[in-house]
Amino acid sequence: MSDIIKRDLEATRNALLNSTAKLMTDCSEPSEVTSRAIAKESGVNLAMINYCFGSREGLLYEVFRKLLSDVQKHDTEFIKIMSSGMSPKQKLTELHFKMMRLMIANYNYSQAVTKYILFNRNDDFGMESLPFIVEHFNGRKNIEDCRLIAFELTSIHELSVLRYETIKSSCNIDLTDDETLKWYICQNINRFLD
């Protein structure tokens, strides 16, 4: 592939990412951010969404992943925690706390990408918890068991974000309250890691 084609493809990817982020920020419902709306906003051929990202959902996930990555890079407190001497279990708690808080604060993104994440998660995708779980068990569980725990724990938390209003009304657990959210995460992590 020539350098010109690579630059054009990268420019197309960036236009799609930036336009999608803008549309997601401005919309009241994620369903408003259609492939056609994204293509129109970015000035890019509709087929390029599938070519660059595999699907609209893949594009939405990339936008969300970039948002999460930007928050993690610029949140000095989070960076300090992740590089501290905290136990893997404590770091896992902080990771899930940050992730769930971000997902609740950006609920439109969460609604749009959670199903995609749940159905496409694999060893390279959506398994940010795995290293902390492996380190926590330190050989007491095999890698397959650790992957299963990472999958189950992350899936529970992602589904909890989607249903946070129902959890509040049915169980009187307000996941928008930081203290309650931290408690909820600790309860779930303890179930899987103890």
Residue ranges and their predicted role:
Residues 1-11:
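N-terminal intrinsically disordered/low-complexity leader segments
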Residues 9, 13-21:
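Short, leucine-enriched amphipathic alpha-helices that occur as contiguous helical runs
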Residues 15, 23-58, 62:
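Helix-turn-helix
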Residues 35, 65-72, 78:
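Short, basic, alpha-helical segments at the C-terminal edge of helix-turn-helix-like DNA-binding modules
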Residues 72-76, 114-148, 183:
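Amphipathic alpha-helical packing segments from all-alpha helical-bundle domains
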Residues 76-109, 143, 150:
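Hydrophobic alpha-helical connector segments
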Residues 101, 112-115, 150-173, 191-194:
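Amphipathic C-terminal alpha-helical segment
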Residues 134-143, 162-194:
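C-terminal peripheral helix-coil segments that are non-catalytic and often amphipathic
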